[in-house]
């Protein structure tokens, strides 16, 4: 998939497509909470595999049972269709 920057109208519609994610100036972000560190780290491991598949990696942090993920496409300087795709796949993992 060749990434392209999302246009203003696409960004406005993005929240409905990837529930739970906040649209920021140059990235999207979401906080995920789990009951313990093992669950949080397991979630991160699953995400790592998706990101490797797309060769697109998040900025993220993990503090005990909380994971915060930020997605953007640095090469293009903003939010792209690839960020949207990965956010959607992350949501699917979280909801399972």
Curated annotation (Swiss-Prot):
EC number: 4.2.1.96
Segments traversing the membrane: none
Entry superkingdom: Bacteria
Primary enzyme class: lyase
GO biological process: tetrahydrobiopterin biosynthetic process
Key word Lipid metabolism present: no
UniProt record similarity statement: Belongs to the pterin-4-alpha-carbinolamine dehydratase family.
Name of this chain's protein: Putative pterin-4-alpha-carbinolamine dehydratase
Gene3D superfamilies membership: Transcriptional coactivator/pterin dehydratase
Keywords for this protein: Lyase
Pfam families: Pterin_4a
Reaction(s) the record says it catalyses: (4aS,6R)-4a-hydroxy-L-erythro-5,6,7,8-tetrahydrobiopterin = (6R)-L-erythro-6,7-dihydrobiopterin + H2O
Organism of this sequence: Prochlorococcus marinus subsp. pastoris (strain CCMP1986 / NIES-2087 / MED4)
GO molecular function annotations of the record: 4-alpha-hydroxytetrahydrobiopterin dehydratase activity
